[in-house]
A protein has these predicted regions:
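Glycine- and charge-rich intrinsically disordered segments
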Residues: 1-79
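Conserved SAM-binding strand-loop segment of SAM-dependent methyltransferases
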Residues: 230-239
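A short SAM/SAH-binding and catalytic strip from SAM-dependent methyltransferases
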Residues: 252-261
Length: 339
């Protein structure tokens, strides 16, 4: 398939799929049968990652003005971005947060070299030990986080350890490949749970005339995303705080999943868990004929209650379903999930 054109020559992964499950429509509250395929990604031999560039350190003078968004959107060219052990990820996060706060204090927009540093922030999925005062091996990291983050930032970071599944470049490429096969080329693109914006960073060349809109609840991730993608319209807040009905041509991303709900007055009556809420709202945000391409929990299809599936089927046509490998998020988010 066609993938993001990269600045460096790197071997392209082999992406194939095979049917693994069939959900009969008459047993699942659907007007049609659903065939789920399993995605196989055969990665080329990895090349050693380049060391992170040193960040230019701006002056520390206080400046309450917002940074001028005059930079260029960042482009991800590292297929192994976000991989590594817990200590490596922790240090990359800390380095990115320190740089973010320096840029904000100086009222500056990140340079391309600084964007490289910020892009290595992977969030706190799989790093719960750093927030646990009862873990002696992580005592210094615990103290460092308490000192570096505001109470609001700390609370958001700690809560994200359970549901922050940052998406690997390989999975993002496969999703864009599928969207491209559907005929999408350019338009208004929404990423409603963007993290630091890896889907924006891997936008294929043929889609680069699109207008980008992102939403991110976590304050640190959202502010890093603004530094990485200054030409995008990014809201740092919950998806429930935004509403652009019938505006987007494509909604894409890796939505949160879990057994809890979002307080959105327009959707509370549905009583949907968070991952299904994102589907329901996104369908209203895209225009008729638009596409929603999300990574979601397998329970969207596997749940015994067919209410969600019937709701979605009444409002949209399912174009395809892919089951990702169990370890699709292991290298980046430190988690094994079925999605």
């Amino acid at each position: 398939g066609l993938f993001t054109r990269q600045e460096k020559e790197t071997p392209a992964p082999e992406i194939t799929s095979e049917p693994v499950t069939v959900y009969p429509g008459d047993k699942n509250g659907l007007p049609y049968d659903v065939v789920v395929e399993r995605l196989h990604i055969d990665e080329p031999e990895p090349t050693p990652p380049e060391p992170a560039p040193s960040a230019e350190r701006p002056d520390h003078q206080e400046n309450t003005e917002q940074p001028r968004r005059t930079g260029q959107n960042f482009r991800i060219t590292d297929d192994h971005l976000g991989e590594g052990g817990p200590r490596l990820k922790y240090q990359a996060n800390i380095t990115a947060i320190r740089l973010l706060k320096e840029l904000e204090a100086a009222g500056q927009q990140a340079s391309p070299e600084q964007q490289e540093v910020l892009s290595r922030y992977v969030g706190w999925g799989g790093l719960s030990d750093a927030f646990d005062p009862e873990k002696p091996a992580w005592a210094s990291e615990y103290a460092q986080l308490k000192e570096l983050l505001t109470p609001e930032e700390y609370a958001a970071a700690r809560s994200s350890t359970l549901n922050a599944h940052y998406t690997s470049p390989m999975v993002i490429k496969a999703i864009y490949d599928a969207v491209g096969r559907m005929g999408f080329e350019t338009g208004n693109i929404l990423e409603p749970s963007m993290g630091v914006g890896n889907f924006f960073g891997m936008l294929p060349e043929k889609m680069r005339n699109s207008r980008l809109y992102g939403v991110e609840l976590d304050p640190v991730s959202g502010r890093i995303a603004k530094q990485l993608y200054p030409k995008a319209d990014i809201t740092v807040g919950g998806f429930e705080t935004t509403d652009r009905r019938d505006f987007f041509d494509l909604a894409i991303g890796n939505v949160p999943f879990g057994q809890y709900q979002v307080n959105d007055k327009a959707y509370n009556k549905l009583n949907f868990n968070i991952h299904n809420y994102f589907f329901a709202k996104a369908l209203n945000q895209v225009r008729p004929g638009g596409v929603v391409a999300f990574v979601t929990s397998r329970y969207t299809m596997d749940a015994k209650d067919s209410t969600v599936r019937r709701y979605l089927a009444q409002r949209a046509e399912l174009l395809g379903a892919i089951r990702l490998p169990n370890d699709a998020f292991k290298k980046n988010a430190g988690a094994e999930v079925v999605s």
